[in-house]
Regions:
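Short Pro-Gly-centered beta-turn/loop motif in secreted/extracellular proteins
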Residues: 77-86, 299-305, 703-721
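Outer-membrane beta-barrel translocator/channel fold
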Residues: 204, 229-241, 401-496, 548-567, ...
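Residues on the lipid-exposed face of transmembrane beta-strands in outer-membrane beta-barrel proteins
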Residues: 159, 180-184, 211-217, 361-365, ...
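Post-signal-peptide, soluble extracytosolic/periplasmic N-terminal scaffold domains
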Residues: 2-6, 10, 15, 22-258, ...
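Transmembrane beta-strand segments that form the barrel wall of outer-membrane beta-barrel proteins
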Residues: 151-169, 186-201, 225-229, 339-348, ...
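A short, solvent-exposed beta-strand micro-motif common in secreted/extracellular proteins
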Residues: 87-93, 309-312, 627-631, 712-721
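Short, acidic Ser/Thr/Gly-rich low-complexity loop/linker segments typical of extracellular
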Residues: 72, 695-703
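Residues that define the transmembrane beta-barrel architecture of outer-membrane proteins
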Residues: 172-178, 206-210, 261, 336, ...
Length: 721
């Protein structure tokens, strides 16, 4: 079972009845659902004993579920009752320390005298107890690979559609955006495609396929094979996208105790707004949000590195932009573990121009409980690189990694450059001071060093002996708005020099916290820097939540913006699942001036699946905007609608999102799908809810989709009448 596979659950009510020891056991077939009463009587003898035969059972060894399959049972003349027919090889796969006698039925009790076996036919269980010294030691959350389920054959589409219509003094226009993540599961193979469509009134629509690939698991190696468009990991080299073939470790197959990361994007909308997120030239996210602070925690990165460029488009058409840095600390590997990745294909990042063939390998090994060794090699057209590093668990000091990369590059003008880059990464939580350094990193590169992406961009920007560079108009005009870049030409290329990143959180008392995210990138042949700074303070006093936030974004090509925001909210709980929250916001930014807003929002219905909000906003030009929105988490998808108006402007917006799953039982509509989801079958249970799933109910055909499940883990699904 994989993080992009579909799993199938069938529900059944099972009841076990135990009578006093001096009484023969009797079974009532009506209490054992999922078994025909006539068939039940065929395997229960007249004296109450279970008859020999083959039964579908869940196999438990020392209370750990290790397998689910048919098992043949025969009479046990030595001990009475029934004995399962399991081979020694099967017991070994279940973690029992025995030798393989190559016989179809291994006599467990003859080899391990203290072993006990019991068939619980009412609950479809084969219960085996074995002394611990005969059992391999597994982590507490271990799941046997034999239980990994490839899932059913199925097809699905996960969609998100948003549109807004605007009318104002400048005329009328409409914007539409549709994101489709689709897939087909056939046996152990999974075919996937991510694509989007968008259209702005008066312009031609645009359809783009972002990525297509096929993948399958190689469970004995705890690995995954991918064919198509994917990206290399960033544990050694910077991650790059490519089209080709990749084989590598899938760490999620390991237990949680033996084993990642996407940034949460935060901001403030002054009115009903659309938020767009771009990475590596792709529009990867577009969502309508109501006025007030927003938090995007479901971003799927196109690449494992590459900053996120966020644009907030307000109801009146004004825009603000900022950058969220995306860097991660390579995970330390446990002693004796290996992580590897082999990639081969052609560079593909969504942009036109030079795209070299490449081959890359990376390997990390847990030398002991303190040190991890890692390194790799990268070969591409006009480019070679090798790297080696050491990661260390320093105990109370924290976790630190250091690596060095040596690279040789042939530039577009034929010059051969060689240089090195050293990188340090650090992470530490100081419990005594409640300080958490989630990421602290520094990289320095010599003038002759080019990463692969730098080498590709150097050739793409080369035109008639000069390099083309982008820049934005001067930001001295405080009414500056995001616009298309302009170009100028130089005789040198701005390759990266040094970069510093830090992400930290400081807890203050019981109800307060301060956070800081900072990134700075400097370049050779340029005195400017790219800077991104986000800082904030959150606290609660007597049920009143408040926060102060600061944000600054600066490009080494002139444009910059900064903002400061004060937010106060007071929640009220009327009754269970019916909440009201009042919020007040005051903000000032270089690009938008001063603005403020006040609003009320809440939830309705028994499970809180209906949300609503009303907001009034103003700015320092006496321009006010009023807005209202409704959101609904439905059985067949999610709906959001909003309306905003001012003296000179009107905007109506709509979001529709959900999933469509086609399977052998038909077609089932659902809420938006995660990368792993489950299909539930419960006939004659129309309208019954699923436990811990807001808005998810059994449809008229007896099916429902649980949109989020955890891969390679035991997931519990239950009906909630």
């Amino acid at each position: 079972m994989d993080d992009s596979k579909l799993r199938y659950f069938a529900s059944a009510w099972l009841i076990s009845i135990t009578l006093p020891a001096d009484s023969a056991e009797r079974y009532n077939a009506q209490f054992v659902n999922g078994i025909d009463p006539l068939a039940f009587n065929q395997f229960v003898a007249s004296d109450g004993d279970v008859m020999p035969g083959t039964y579908d059972v869940n196999i438990y060894i020392n209370d750990l579920l290790v397998d689910s399959r048919p098992v043949r049972f025969s009479e046990d003349s030595a001990h009475g009752g029934l004995a399962p027919c399991l081979s020694a090889a099967e017991y070994i796969r279940y973690g029992v320390k025995i030798d393989d006698d190559h016989q179809p039925c291994f006599a467990l009790s003859q080899t391990i005298r203290q072993a006990e076996q019991q068939l619980d036919i009412a609950n479809h269980r084969l219960i085996i107890h074995i002394p611990q010294q005969y059992i391999e030691h597994y982590p507490r959350d271990y799941v046997s690979p034999m239980r990994f389920d490839e899932g059913i054959n199925a097809a699905f589409v996960n969609y998100s559609y948003s549109t807004d219509a605007n009318n104002g003094d400048g005329g009328s226009h409409q914007y539409q955006y549709l994101s489709l993540n689709s897939g087909i599961n056939i046996a152990s193979w999974r075919l996937r495609n991510n694509a989007y469509w968008n259209k702005f009134s008066g312009q031609a629509d645009k359809w783009q396929s972002i990525a297509s690939w096929a993948e399958t698991n190689i469970i004995p190696w705890r690995s995954r094979l991918v064919v198509g468009q994917t990206s290399t990991d960033n544990s050694v080299f910077d991650s790059v996208q490519f089209r080709g073939v990749q084989l590598g470790t899938d760490a999620e197959m390991r237990p949680s105790s033996q084993t990642g990361f996407a940034p949460v994007i935060r901001g403030v909308a002054n009115s009903n707004a659309r938020v767009e997120v771009r990475q590596n030239n792709y529009l990867i996210y577009s969502e309508n949000v109501p006025a007030g602070p927003f938090e995007l925690n479901d971003i799927s990165a196109v690449n494992r590195s590459g900053d996120f460029y966020v644009t907030v488009i307000e109801a009146d058409g004004s825009q603000t932009t900022f950058t969220v840095a995306y860097t991660t600390l390579p995970q330390l590997v446990r002693a004796g573990q290996w992580n590897y990745q082999l990639s081969a294909g052609k560079y593909h990042d969504g942009a036109d121009g030079y795209a070299p063939a490449l081959m890359q390998s990376s390997l990390s090994y847990g030398l002991n409980n303190t040190f991890t060794l890692y390194g790799g090699a990268l070969a591409a057209e006009n480019y070679r690189a090798g790297a080696f590093g050491v990661g260390s668990n320093l105990g109370e000091i924290g976790a630190l990694s250091a690596d060095y990369t040596l690279a040789g590059t042939t530039l577009a003008n034929g010059q051969r450059k060689q240089g090195g880059s050293v990188r340090f990464l650090y992470a530490k939580s100081f419990l005594s001071s409640k300080t958490d350094f989630q990421i602290a990193g520094y990289r320095y590169s010599t003038a002759g060093y080019y990463s692969l992406s730098d080498a590709v961009n150097e050739r793409r920007r080369w035109h008639n002996g000069l390099y083309e560079n982008d820049y934005w108009p001067s930001d001295e005009d405080e009414s500056w708005q995001a616009s298309a870049p302009q170009h100028y030409y130089t005789s040198w290329f701005y390759n990266k020099k040094h970069r510093f990143d830090i992400s930290a959180r400081q807890t203050l008392g019981k109800n307060s916290a301060f956070f800081l995210n900072f990134s700075q990138q400097n370049y050779w042949n340029s005195s400017g820097s790219d800077i991104s700074l986000q800082a904030g303070f959150n606290s609660t006093i007597h049920n009143v939540n408040y926060g102060l936030y600061y944000q600054n974004t600066r490009s080494h090509f002139t444009h910059d913006d900064n903002s400061i925001t004060l937010r106060v909210s007071i929640p009220f709980t009327l009754q269970e699942n019916r909440r009201i929250n009042t919020a007040f916001t005051l903000a000032h930014s270089k690009s938008s001036g001063t603005s403020g807003q006040a609003g009320v929002n809440g939830t309705l219905l028994d499970d809180g699946r209906l949300s609503w909000a009303v907001t009034s906003a103003y700015d320092d030009t006496s321009h006010s905007t009023n807005s209202a929105s409704l959101g609904y988490l439905g059985q067949y998808g999610n709906l959001y609608t909003g309306y905003a108006y001012s003296k000179s402007h009107r905007q109506a917006s709509l979001n529709l999102s959900g999933g469509v799953v086609a399977h052998r039982g038909g077609v089932t509509l659902s809420q938006p799908l995660g990368s792993t989801f489950a299909l539930v079958e419960a006939k004659d249970a129309q309208g019954v809810g699923i436990e811990n799933q807001t808005g998810v109910r059994i449809d008229p055909f007896g099916y429902a989709v649980v949109p989020q499940s955890v891969p390679y883990r035991v997931n519990s699904v239950a009906l909630n009448p």
